[in-house]
Amino acid sequence: SSAASDVYKRQVVYHANYIKFFERARSEFLSDNKISQSELKKNDQAFVIKSVNIKYIAAAELGDNIYVESEVEKKSNARMIFNQKVINCDNEKEYAIGVVEVCFINLVTKKPQKFPDDLLLIFD
């Protein structure tokens, strides 16, 4: 991924865009594992963010090639906590580290719902 579309006039990545990078990485992971968020939505199910905690270490700049490393720290029937890092592809420099708490809900009731078994399996 390139940080090119997410930069300030000063040529550094705007702080809020690191949340977008985290989101893209989680979405790509689901897609790569054949979990369709649009299909979940048709079944009145969705992922929602309960909390995000980010520590900014350095600013990514225009032209930096980055990737996001993600791991599930903890999971329960309706909640997962991800540790995520935005890292430079060329020199492994860390730009930001984050902890993201994701819940699974029923869109009609707006209440937590158990993850489907196939989804839980990909996080083992």
Language model region names:
Residues 1-8:
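Short, small-residue-biased leader/transition segments that mark boundaries at the very start
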Residues 16-18:
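Early exported N-terminus immediately downstream of N-terminal targeting peptides
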Residues 25:
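Helix-loop element at the rim of GNAT/NAT acetyltransferase active sites that forms part
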Residues 29-67, 71-80, 98:
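Hydrophobic beta-strand-centered segment that forms part of the acyl-chain substrate-binding groove
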Residues 31, 61-62, 73-124:
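HotDog/MaoC-like acyl-thioester-processing domains
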